[in-house]
Every structure is written in C-alpha cells, then in structure tokens.
Amino acid sequence: MKEVIDTVGRRKTSVARVFMSPGKGKIVVNKLPVEEYFKDEFKRSQALKPLAVAEKQNDFDITINVKGGGLTGQSGAVSLAIARALVEFDESIRAALRPDRLLTRDPRMVERKKYGKKKARKSFQFSKR
C-alpha cells in the first residue's frame, strides 16, 4: 500500500490541495499535466520550486486540486502545499526550504475598496477651482 501525503496551501484567494506519493515524478494539476495547466514557464517553476530546492523532482507522483483566484495565486498556493508535503515526508528538508521562505504563507491580500474613493487608495480627481 502506498503512503499518500495530503496537504493544503493558500495564496491570495487560491486554495491548493496536494496528494503526494512516492513515484516517478508525474505531476497532474486539475486532471491536466503541469506543463498544460501552468503554460507560463515562470509560474510553473514557481509552483515546483520546493521540489527543485529539495532535489526531489523525480521522486514523487503528485496530484493537485487547485481552485480560486488566478494563475499567480494558484502557483503560490501549489508551491506552499508541495513544500508542506515534502516536510511531512522528511523533516530534514525543512532546513533546505527555509532560506527561500517556501514554508511561509504569504499574508498579502487585495486591499478593499473604500467609499468616497475610486479604488482602494486612488482618489477621484480634485479640482481647486
């Protein structure tokens, strides 16, 4: 029986659920290959950065369910979830992931729009005369 590690990662409004098991390096995101889902090379490398830092690219089969937000938030959520799964698999990997802040939940969220303003901080045009 295979051991499956289940973790969750969040970023902005995106939530990623990762199911990681020992395997050959097959990565599936929402039933699509990772290359098809994250077409942008930067977003794909950002999502898979914990595997690269831990040098475990071909050691695990990973199934990812991600929803909410856009691709940037989703790649950040996937990255955090994979990092947490790697630490759950082997606690010694934590030291390698720490310097790149891969285990830290990014707290930045979209600032809400305020009344009397055009956006969160932008004011309407002001005319003195």
From Swiss-Prot:
One of its GO terms (molecular function) is RNA binding. InterPro entries: Ribosomal_Su5_D2-typ_SF, Ribosomal_uS9, Ribosomal_uS9_bac/plastid, Ribosomal_uS9_CS, Ribsml_uS5_D2-typ_fold_subgr. Residues 108-129 are annotated as: Disordered. Keywords: Ribonucleoprotein, Ribosomal protein. One of its GO terms (biological process) is translation. Residues 114-129 have a biased composition (Basic residues). GO terms for cellular component: cytoplasm; small ribosomal subunit. Gene3D superfamilies: 3.30.230.10. It holds the Pfam family Ribosomal_S9. Transmembrane segments: none annotated. Disulfide bonds: none annotated. HAMAP family: Ribosomal_uS9_B (MF_00532_B). Belongs to the universal ribosomal protein uS9 family. PANTHER family: RIBOSOMAL PROTEIN S9, SMALL RIBOSOMAL SUBUNIT PROTEIN US9M. This is Small ribosomal subunit protein uS9. It comes from Chlorobaculum tepidum (strain ATCC 49652 / DSM 12025 / NBRC 103806 / TLS). The gene is rpsI.
